[in-house]
């Protein structure tokens, strides 16, 4: 071994002992013939005293050293209570340089602000900094905790293929050419969905996996083309069983950061979430529910409010906002595809001012504050139009109001997780289908060519009361699905699955997949359902998002060892990169698949 102790192990119990340690030079300070070196390794820091000028003179930051010396107590008054090794120092007897370091592109110091591009380009240096290092270790603990819990529940960890066939699942596939089958392609899995269902057909009964998933999506903020999920599936379960297991996992994970999550966690229907919060992932750390004013303004003279839906959200104290701030709200709304954000200001004397107040009737003005629950000094924002789009705008405004008014406290930026606000909710009874045009408009890929596509995925079972009617009335059918939301972030989603071939074929038909197309894409699943598939269901947690919340960081890039940028580019390796003409030829990128040979007739 190159060392006898890690730096984090050095403490007063070792005073008088000779030890050998290794690490990087974090900082050096010269004091007239003696140098103090702050040495860093993965476990922490320790102060090394080097008295030989020949040893300390050449040392520079991030050089890699091996130091042998004696542990001594620091002189009185020089202790550092912020370090586990703060009572002692290591008096160096020998200093060996294991490697030198070139001039650094940025300082390996958590107190120095560094641009994300530089940090990702030199991620190996960034990971030496305390916070990224802590996050990697937290992620390891999260993995270990989940594995131990699921093992205790009788689950089996099974690895599913990462080279499979392309199956439409709601996003675009990453495709891999098959060199030995020119013109044919593998796809990287968007999720282990089909394989974990087939494991239930295979009698595994309780499966889990910390799975890598791949989706070739359009550039979106804080999305990664490859991501991780904790994937779980079990046979002979109902919704309550999966939810109970999910709550055990959440409780165990948040306990790692000192947060006790009360269970059972509240449940809310999708319809209630959209009506009250304008989102299927509501942030319940604060109130400010939306108010439906459609009936209130049914006879309004204001043409803008003569619409299918009119709603409002209150900003406490918002009447004191400057005009430029109110104008900025309009730009904020336009960035979200709206024409603007109508408002009224309720003055301290109760008078209504602002653009909307000039266009509504005196009777409407008189009762408005009471209708929306506003007080003098508040601002009321409105949206009118299609219910889905209008509620979404108000829901986003609600969260922005909560942030600007300080109605909740996030972890991070000096706030420990145990001191932050946390609110969890299960959102249940979501629609089974949505118009395919809506899915495409939001950046997803419709699975079939029909007018409808699945909200969750094509393998989600309808709720029992819709089992016989979902194909006749797709817009009314509810899914046997459940999503868990934390502080406005969806951290997991699951459903009871379809386990009967006839039901699965009916779902494919609603989505516009012909029997031939369904058999071509999903024939292996439909075939499996012929042989006694058990009732089953599961859940998948977005592992990167879970770790980001626990770590108190806004970006999932911070919790991935080597992340891509928002555009899918890797500054470290330069991926994606062109391939050579030879590679292109060998991979068969431009090859056409050979026609399938007709199967030979069986002999009589």
Swiss-Prot record:
InterPro entries: Aa-tRNA-synt_II (IPR004364), aa-tRNA-synth_II (IPR006195), aa-tRNA-synth_II/BPL/LPL (IPR045864), Asp-tRNA-ligase_1 (IPR004524), Asp-tRNA-ligase_1_N (IPR047089), Asp/Asn-tRNA-synth_IIb (IPR002312), AspRS_core (IPR047090), GAD-like_sf (IPR004115). It comes from Micrococcus luteus (strain ATCC 4698 / DSM 20030 / JCM 1464 / CCM 169 / CCUG 5858 / IAM 1056 / NBRC 3333 / NCIMB 9278 / NCTC 2665 / VKM Ac-2230) (Micrococcus lysodeikticus). Its main location: cytoplasm. Belongs to the class-II aminoacyl-tRNA synthetase family. Type 1 subfamily. Residues 193-196 are annotated as: Aspartate. The record marks 31, 77 as: Important for tRNA non-discrimination. SUPFAM superfamilies: Class II aaRS and biotin synthetases (SSF55681), GAD domain-like (SSF55261), Nucleic acid-binding proteins (SSF50249). Residues 571-604 are annotated as: Disordered. It catalyses: tRNA(Asx) + L-aspartate + ATP = L-aspartyl-tRNA(Asx) + AMP + diphosphate. It holds the Pfam family GAD. Its EC number is 6.1.1.23. ATP binds at residues 215-217, 224, 490, 542-545. GO terms for molecular function: aspartate-tRNA ligase activity; aspartate-tRNA(Asn) ligase activity; ATP binding; nucleic acid binding. CDD domains: AspRS_core, EcAspRS_like_N. Aspartyl-tRNA synthetase with relaxed tRNA specificity since it is able to aspartylate not only its cognate tRNA(Asp) but also tRNA(Asn). Reaction proceeds in two steps: L-aspartate is first activated by ATP to form Asp-AMP and then transferred to the acceptor end of tRNA(Asp/Asn). It is found in: Cytoplasm. Transmembrane segments: none annotated. Keywords: Aminoacyl-tRNA synthetase, ATP-binding, Cytoplasm, Ligase, Nucleotide-binding, Protein biosynthesis. This is Aspartate--tRNA(Asp/Asn) ligase. L-aspartate binds at residues 169, 215, 456, 497. One of its GO terms (biological process) is aspartyl-tRNA aminoacylation. One of its GO terms (cellular component) is cytoplasm. Homodimer.
């Amino acid at each position: 071994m190159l060392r006898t102790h890690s730096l984090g192990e050095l403490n007063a119990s070792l005073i008088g002992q000779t030890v050998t340690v290794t690490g990087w030079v974090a900082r050096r300070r010269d004091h007239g013939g003696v140098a103090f070196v702050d040495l860093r390794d993965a476990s922490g820091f320790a102060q090394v005293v080097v008295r030989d000028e020949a040893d300390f003179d050449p040392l520079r930051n991030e050089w890699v050293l091996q130091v042998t010396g004696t542990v001594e107590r620091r002189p009185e008054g020089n202790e550092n209570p912020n370090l586990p090794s703060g009572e002692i120092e290591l008096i160096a007897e020998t200093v060996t340089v294991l490697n030198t370091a070139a001039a650094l592109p940025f300082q390996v110091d958590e107190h120095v602000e560094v641009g994300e591009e530089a940090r990702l380009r030199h991620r190996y240096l960034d990971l030496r900094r305390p916070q990224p290092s802590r996050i990697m270790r937290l992620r390891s603990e999260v993995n270990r905790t989940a594995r131990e819990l699921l093992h205790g529940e009788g689950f089996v960890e099974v690895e599913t293929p990462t080279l499979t066939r392309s199956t439409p699942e709601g996003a675009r596939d990453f495709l891999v050419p098959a060199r030995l089958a020119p013109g044919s392609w593998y796809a990287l899995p968007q999720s282990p969905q089909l394989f974990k269902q087939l494991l239930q057909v295979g009698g595994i009964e309780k499966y889990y996996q910390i799975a890598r998933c791949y989706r070739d999506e359009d550039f979106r903020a804080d999305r990664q083309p490859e991501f991780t999920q904790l994937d779980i599936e079990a046979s002979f379960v109902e919704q309550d069983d999966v939810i109970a297991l999910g709550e055990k996992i959440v409780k165990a994970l948040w306990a790692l950061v000192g947060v006790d999550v009360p269970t059972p966690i509240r449940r809310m229907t999708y319809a209630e979430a959209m009506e009250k919060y304008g989102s299927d992932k509501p942030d319940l750390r604060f109130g400010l529910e939306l108010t439906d004013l459609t009936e209130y303004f049914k006879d309004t003279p204001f043409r803008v409010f003569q619409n299918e839906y009119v709603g409002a959200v209150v900003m406490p104290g918002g009447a004191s906002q400057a005009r430029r701030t109110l104008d900025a709200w309009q730009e904020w709304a336009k960035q979200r595809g709206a024409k603007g954000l109508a408002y009224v200001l309720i003055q301290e004397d109760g008078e209504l001012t602002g653009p909307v107040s000039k266009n509504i009737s005196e009777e409407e003005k008189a009762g408005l504050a009471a209708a929306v629950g506003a007080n003098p000094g508040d601002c009321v924002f409105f949206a009118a139009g299609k219910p889905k789009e209008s509620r979404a705008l108000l829901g986003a405004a609600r969260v922005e109001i909560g942030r600007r008014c300080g109605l909740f406290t996030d972890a991070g930026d000096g706030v420990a997780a145990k001191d932050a606000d946390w609110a969890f909710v299960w959102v249940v009874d979501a629609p089974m289908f949505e118009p395919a045009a809506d899915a495409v408009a939001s950046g997803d890929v419709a699975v079939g060519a029909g007018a409808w596509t699945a909200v969750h995925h094509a393998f989600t079972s309808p709720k029992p009361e819709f089992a016989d009617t979902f194909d006749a009335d797709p817009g009314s059918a509810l899914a046997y699905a459940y999503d868990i939301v934390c502080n406005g972030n969806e951290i997991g989603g699951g459903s009871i699955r379809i386990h009967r071939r006839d039901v699965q074929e009916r779902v494919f038909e609603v989505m516009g997949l012909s029997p031939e197309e369904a058999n071509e894409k999903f024939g292996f699943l439909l075939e499996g359902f012929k042989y006694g598939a058990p009732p089953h269901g599961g859940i998948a947690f977005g592992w990167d998002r879970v770790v980001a919340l626990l770590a108190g960081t806004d970006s999932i890039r911070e919790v991935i060892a080597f992340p891509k940028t928002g555009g899918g580019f890797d500054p470290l390796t330069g991926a994606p990169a062109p391939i050579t003409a030879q590679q292109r030829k060998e991979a068969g990128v431009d090859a056409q698949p050979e026609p399938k040979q007709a199967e030979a007739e069986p002999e009589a």
